[in-house]
C-alpha cells in the first residue's frame, strides 16, 4: 500500500483557520493551535450573541417606550394593555421609533390607550 502524504490537505486546513483568525491579537492570529481554539470560541460567542441580540434590542425598545409613556403619564404595562384594548397592532420596534422621532404621534397613541383603559 502506498504511503499517503497529507501535507497539502493539512496546509489548506491550517490556511483556512489562520485566514479566519486574521486580525486576532498575537499568537491567536499566527499559531495554528491557538488560532483554532480562538476561532472555535469566536464561533460559540457569535452563535450565542445572535440570540442575545434579539433580547437586547427588545429590552432597548421596551425601555424607550416606557420612558416616553411615563412622560405622558402612563406606565409601560398600562400603555401596552391600553393599546391592546384599543386594537392598535404596532410592534415594539415601531413604537420605540415613534417614541424617539415623533413625540406628537406617540402622545396621540398614549391618549388612545388611556381612552381604551377608561
Curated annotation (Swiss-Prot):
The keyword RNA-binding applies. Keywords: Ribonucleoprotein, Ribosomal protein, RNA-binding, rRNA-binding. Transmembrane segments: none annotated. GO terms for cellular component: ribonucleoprotein complex; ribosome. It comes from the Bacteria. InterPro entries: Ribosomal_bL20 (IPR005813), RIBOSOMAL_L20_CS (IPR049946), Ribosomal_protein_bL20_C (IPR035566). Signal peptide: none annotated. The keyword RNA-binding applies. PROSITE patterns: RIBOSOMAL_L20. GO terms for biological process: ribosomal large subunit assembly; translation. GO terms for molecular function: rRNA binding; structural constituent of ribosome. PANTHER family: 39S RIBOSOMAL PROTEIN L20. Belongs to the bacterial ribosomal protein bL20 family. Binds directly to 23S ribosomal RNA and is necessary for the in vitro assembly process of the 50S ribosomal subunit. It is not involved in the protein synthesizing functions of that subunit. This is Large ribosomal subunit protein bL20. It comes from Pectobacterium atrosepticum (strain SCRI 1043 / ATCC BAA-672). The lineage of its organism: Bacteria, Pseudomonadati, Pseudomonadota, Gammaproteobacteria, Enterobacterales. The gene is rplT.
Amino acid at each position: 500500500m502506498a504511503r499517503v502524504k497529507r501535507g497539502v490537505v493539512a496546509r489548506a486546513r491550517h490556511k483556512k483557520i489562520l485566514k479566519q483568525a486574521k486580525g486576532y491579537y498575537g499568537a491567536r492570529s499566527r499559531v495554528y493551535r491557538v488560532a483554532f481554539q480562538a476561532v472555535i470560541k469566536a464561533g460559540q460567542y457569535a452563535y450565542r450573541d445572535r440570540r442575545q441580540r434579539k433580547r437586547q434590542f427588545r429590552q432597548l425598545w421596551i425601555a424607550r417606550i416606557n420612558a416616553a409613556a411615563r412622560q405622558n403619564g402612563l406606565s409601560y404595562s398600562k400603555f401596552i394593555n391600553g393599546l391592546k384594548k384599543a386594537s392598535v397592532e404596532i410592534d415594539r420596534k415601531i413604537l420605540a421609533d415613534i417614541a424617539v422621532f415623533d413625540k406628537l404621534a406617540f402622545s396621540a397613541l398614549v391618549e388612545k390607550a388611556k381612552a381604551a383603559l377608561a
